[in-house]
Regions:
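Glycine-rich FAD pyrophosphate-binding loop
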Residues: 11-38
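Dinucleotide-binding Rossmann-like beta1-alpha1 core, especially the glycine-rich loop
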Residues: 42-121, 130
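Helical element adjacent to the flavin cofactor pocket in flavoenzyme catalytic cores
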Residues: 134-187
Length: 187
């Protein structure tokens, strides 16, 4: 996902600045699109992180997923963290920080309150031992492989070339510097 996303956004930025376009960009993949971790990831799109900097980055990321849900095979169903007492304080901190950055979520505390909230959503709710619910209204899930092909289509739509089934064998450096001037593959 990182390579495809970088190529896509770089192509947009080059065009915006009038310094080129996607045809200046080549992605080399030794196997195929979605063959690595992105193709087997669980596909959850959420903003449930303990690090404040990560939370702001993920809030931005969720907006990107929402920007083209069809291409990214994204389903905006929200995200819930349903927790026992041992996690309540940490989850409360996440909820406070989400509120501070304007990320829409609901935080429910207390065993009775949590059970009631969940019963309001699922009338057959039966789980015991929960004392907090963090319900993120944005977020959801994506069909991972379809999302990667959707992102590849967006990148190619901007002129980015994608070469699959190629192994990088060598980097050529220019003029005695560390600057890479060429990439040698087995194709």
């Amino acid at each position: 996902i990182h390579g495809l996303s970088t190529a896509y956004h770089l192509a947009l930025e080059l065009q915006r600045k009038g310094e080129g376009d996607g045809s200046d960009i080549l992605i080399i993949d030794k196997t195929s699109i979605a063959a690595g971790a992105s193709g087997i990831a669980c596909g959850v799109v959420r903003n449930n992180y303990y690090q404040p900097a990560m939370r702001e980055l993920m809030a931005h990321s969720v907006k990107v997923w929402e920007s083209d849900s069809k291409a990214y095979s994204y389903h905006p169903v929200g995200y819930m963290q349903i927790s026992p007492e041992v996690m309540r304080e940490d989850v409360s901190t996440i909820a406070e920080q989400q509120k501070d950055i304007g990320y829409e979520s609901v935080f429910i505390e207390g065993a009775r309150e949590s059970h009631s909230y969940m019963r309001g959503l699922f009338d057959d709710w039966q789980a015991q031992g929960i004392t907090s619910v963090l319900h993120e209204k944005p977020g959801g899930y994506s069909n991972n492989t379809q999302a990667m092909y959707g992102l590849a289509d967006k990148a190619e739509g901007e002129g980015v070339r994608i070469l699959t089934g190629a192994t990088v064998q060598e980097f050529k450096r220019g003029n005695g510097s560390d600057a890479i001037t060429a990439v040698v593959t087995d194709r």
